Swiss-Prot record:
Record-annotated disulphide pairs: none
Gene: atpA
Keyword presence, Ligase: no
UniProt organism field: Thermotoga maritima (strain ATCC 43589 / DSM 3109 / JCM 10099 / NBRC 100826 / MSB8)
Enzyme superclass (EC): translocase
Protein name stated in the entry: ATP synthase subunit alpha
Stretches that traverse the bilayer: none
Membrane topology: Peripheral membrane protein
GO biological process: proton motive force-driven ATP synthesis
Length: 503
């Protein structure tokens, strides 16, 4: 049999002409550009915004971020160095989910829920999408239970309730993280599960925080979510949503959870980086137009659920860093307007030795007051007034030579109360102890003491109360109010102690 080469060529040409390439452009695509943690892909015609995609050759995941006419912008969740032009991307037809549940307690994970602590895999039984719609008004109930921070200045004048969103704001190195960590340590035995989300921080700083939480036994009920400064912007962007989903698991199963976002300034910077790389139009301070929505959809998920949904709560403590005390910058004003109050820390107070450096005049809690225990309300009302008057007179007193006795008494009281509000780091105080020491302050029992003796008085007085008058502390703890009977006992106890206290 003779083979005619011309005939074979003709057949091949016809076959090639009639060949139709069946590429599935609906569920797959090809990478046309990659770099700086983002990729652009051709195809993926049916992909939805925020949908999870996978780079087939490397197994790395990404999120569809920009849907454009001729391509899809993808943020890469992990190492992008091995992804090359021409690689295949496929839809996964779901959004990012993270493992949730008790299995994560005591663990350090990345924003995808993968362990970073070398303690083996996390065998979680439950998963939750990182983005959900915040529950509406009818699914919520008013904030009515206190979340004790153990910090006198906060629990007395800026009280936080379970289900509240309270912003901690201030310049760098003013003690913002310290307040959040103290609050987590103080939840020991309170039935509150804690999630600490570290965004864009140095790994050494995060390691120090984890070490402190371990040291004080707080890791038993805490999960740490880490997206450090060396992680891609994409992971820093999803970190708070992942932490929120982990906290929501407890809230929706009728328990109480606390999430600390440390900090949302770096979160906004990571989102700005991704948006600019994706060529989204920049707005004020080069942030994209939807930067407000970025934080509002996160913080609206803090909730106090009604009894029908189990009555659980998710409390949020976002942290925002200011530059040179400027709380009127873009991100600070955004987050202030979203949250239910703010704790404002001032470098001036910090360097003057007033720690925690809380500016009580500019700090406010818009809903926590209704969650405060009655005993604390009874002493805190006077405290707030005394300090407000002291702040007014303080500047005036520096210039005035002669002061009338009433003004002098007000300044003396204010100085002692400011001293009383100082507190060591990592030493949160139970609410009943706070009530008795603040009672001594606002009722003038410290007015005749030198300012430098106030801290020693507080320490020895509490020891005396535990040794001789534990019944008063127990009474405040159980009844949650200062009855006239308890008040009389407390006055007698303070007077008794003052006879033995030597200056």
């Amino acid at each position: 049999m003779r083979i005619n080469p011309g005939e074979i060529t003709k057949v091949l040409e016809e076959k090639i002409k009639s060949f139709e390439e069946k590429i599935d452009l609906e569920d797959t695509g090809k990478v046309i550009q990659v770099g700086d943690g983002i990729a652009r892909a051709y195809g993926l015609n049916k992909v939805m915004v925020s949908e999870l995609v996978e780079f087939v050759e490397t197994g790395v995941k990404g999120v569809a971020f920009n849907l454009e006419e001729d391509n899809v912008g993808i943020i890469i969740l992990g190492e992008y160095k091995d992804i090359k032009e021409g690689h295949t991307v496929r839809r996964l037809k779901r959004i990012i989910e993270v493992p949730v549940g008790e299995e994560l307690l005591g663990r350090v994970v990345n924003p995808l829920g993968e362990p970073l602590d070398g303690k083996g895999p996390i065998n979680a039984k439950n998963f939750r999408p990182i983005e959900i719609k915040a529950p509406g008004v009818i699914y919520r109930k008013p904030v009515d239970t206190p979340l004790q921070t153990g910090i006198k200045a906060i629990d007395s004048m800026i009280p936080i309730g379970r289900g509240q969103r309270e912003l901690i704001i201030g310049d760098r190195q003013t003690g913002k993280t310290a307040i959040a960590i103290d609050t987590i340590i103080n939840q020991k035995g309170q039935g509150v599960y804690c999630i600490y989300v570290a965004i864009g921080q140095k790994k050494s700083a995060i390691a120090r925080i984890i070490d402190k939480l371990r040291q004080y036994g707080a890791m038993e009920y805490t999960t740490v979510v880490v997206a450090s400064a060396s992680d891609p912007a994409s992971l820093q962007y999803i970190a708070p949503y992942a932490g929120c989903a982990m906290g929501e698991y407890f809230a929706y199963s009728g328990r109480d959870a606390l999430v600390v976002y440390d900090d949302l300034s770096k979160h906004a910077v990571a989102y700005r980086q991704l948006s600019l790389l994706m060529r989204r139009p920049p707005g004020r301070e080069a942030y994209p137009g939807d930067i407000f929505y970025l934080h509002s959809r996160l913080l609206e998920r803090a909730v106090r659920l009604n009894d029908k949904l189990g009555g659980g709560s998710l409390t949020a403590l976002p942290i925002v860093e200011t530059q040179a005390n400027d709380i009127s910058a873009y991100i600070p004003t955004n987050v202030i307007s979203i949250t239910d109050g703010q704790i404002y820390l001032e470098p001036g107070l910090f360097y003057a030795g007033q720690r925690p450096a809380i500016n009580v005049g500019l700090s406010v809690s818009r809903v926590g007051g209704s969650a405060q225990i009655k005993a604390m309300k009874q002493v805190a009302g006077m405290l707030r007034i005394d300090l407000a008057q002291y702040r007014e007179l303080e500047t005036f007193a520096q210039f005035a030579t002669e002061l009338d006795p009433a003004t002098r008494a007000q300044i003396i009281r204010g100085q002692r109360l400011m001293e009383l509000l100082k507190q060591e780091q990592y030493s949160p105080m139970p609410v009943e102890e706070q009530v008795v020491v603040l009672f001594a302050g606002v009722r003038g029992y410290l007015d005749d003491l030198p300012v430098e003796e106030v801290r020693r008085f507080e320490k020895e007085f509490l020891r005396f109360m535990h040794e001789k008058h534990q019944d008063i502390l127990d009474d405040i703890k159980t009844k949650k109010e200062l009855t006239s009977e308890t008040e009389e006992k407390l006055k007698k106890a303070i007077e008794e102690f003052k006879t033995t206290f030597r200056v």
